[in-house]
Amino acid sequence: MDLLVMLLSLLVSYLIFKIWKRIDSKRDQNCYILDYQCHKPSDDRMVNTQFSGDIILRNKHLRLNEYKFLLKAIVSSGIGEQTYAPRLFFEGREQRPTLQDGLSEMEEFYIDTIEKVLKRNKISPSEIDILVVNVSMLNSTPSLSARIINHYKMREDIKVFNLTAMGCSASVISIDIVKNIFKTYKNKLALVVTSESLSPNWYSGNNRSMILANCLFRSGGCAVLLTNKRSLSRRAMFKLRCLVRTHHGARDDSFNACVQKEDELGHIGVHLDKTLPKAATRAFIDNLKVITPKILPVTELLRFMLCLLLKKLRSSPSKGSTNVTQAAPKAGVKAGINFKTGIDHFCIHTGGKAVIDAIGYSLDLNEYDLEPARMTLHRFGNTSASSLWYVLGYMEAKKRLKRGDRVFMISFGAGFKCNSCVWEVVRDLNVGEAVGNVWNHCINQYPPKSILNPFFEKYGWIHEEEDPDTFKMPEGFM
């Protein structure tokens, strides 16, 4: 009898040990953001209204209609007066870039951000175990990741990933790589470096589908410090709750929606196809289908299913009736999902005013929810994959982020991709702590009373019909 009791005790103890071991291992797989640092280029790289007009005029391939199209795009873009461009633009060499221009642009960015984020957290470059670099439009040899390792003399056994051509959704992809490595290796520190090189990618042709990219993209970048160390969890800012990636590259129309190619004259640029909005919508819907059950409470999912059922019943034609319109659904039944039941803040990619408006409409968001994305677009423009971190920085600077809040990051990229993730705020974040917040110098000015682009006043003539043969540039334009 005693032997049986002893065996049962050993069995129970073994089961408890295995359960505890599994739970304990899961705890070490958590992905935390310790800190992040967005890049603010120097003021001598600031782009204002007059300078934007000067750059446009330097392109001798543009005709009147292309000038007007380009200026209209800038007017309606939601971009303000204080965004940044690469140095060669101010030297008048945007149509004659060199490889060194792109490398210097990236070096200026990563030295600024990496040094600040490591110094602030008292971490040596040699302590970094994982390095993920994503810059879509610059592919050098050695790689940018190798240049960072060389500059900071990092360890020989560092795990390195250099991502290119992943588009504006590359930040979330980089986080996914780190998350998966954290599942295998314990007690690690990771550094994600995200930016875009504009220097070698200015389009100097006149194809409308390709000059649009010149209007939207601006210089920027971010370095993000992550860990799965349990000992550092109390210092962390955010904890990753879930991440979903959607890729529609198998569909030809989605694949061709955003493509780098040559135009008829041989000028290389990024072609934005008219199918882009539809491709983005499809990818967004498919992404939401997967992530929604992971982030919303069961009560909201049940409410949504009940609303759909009621809507379907009301729209069904009655027996013996052949007129479907007689069974039209009545007003008052809301079938949309309320994402605010599980999400507190929405971190939206600043791909443009239309992108922000479309996501806001789809998720039934108000102006308070969209303010961080709109203000980021206005102040920094579309900084590609790093734009999400500027939006997050705005929320932090405005003291919106409280312990337990959940932040929904949504990004889009060529391919076509939609990637999203949800972060939980681990502790209250106050701007007093974040001495390196890129918004600290100007947050009191936002939101401004108006974000009307000065082009609207200065270049109002672009909305007038003109004869290209008799048209003369207005006085003061040049």
Swiss-Prot record:
Q: What is the superkingdom listed in this entry's lineage? A: Eukaryota
Q: Which pathway does the UniProt entry assign to this protein?
A: Lipid metabolism; fatty acid biosynthesis
Catalyses: a very-long-chain acyl-CoA + malonyl-CoA + H(+) = a very-long-chain 3-oxoacyl-CoA + CO2 + CoA
User: For this protein, what is the EC number?
Assistant: 2.3.1.199
What Gene Ontology terms describe what this protein does at the molecular function level?
fatty acid elongase activity
The residues responsible for catalysis, as annotated, are: 168, 247, 345, 349, 378, 382
A biological process from GO: response to cold
Chain ranges of the FAE domain: 26-313
Xref: CDD domains: CHS_like
Disulfide bond positions: none
Q: What induces it?
A: Repressed by herbicides such as flufenacet and benfuresate. Down-regulated by darkness and low temperature, and up-regulated by salt, drought and osmotic stress.
Q: Which UniProt keywords apply?
A: Acyltransferase, Endoplasmic reticulum, Signal, Transferase
GO cellular component terms? endoplasmic reticulum; membrane
Q: Show the InterPro entries listed in the entry.
A: 3-ktacl-CoA_syn (IPR012392), ACP_syn_III_C (IPR013747), FAE1_typ3_polyketide_synth (IPR013601), Thiolase-like (IPR016039)
Provide the family line: Belongs to the thiolase-like superfamily. Chalcone/stilbene synthases family.
| Record protein name field | 3-ketoacyl-CoA synthase 3
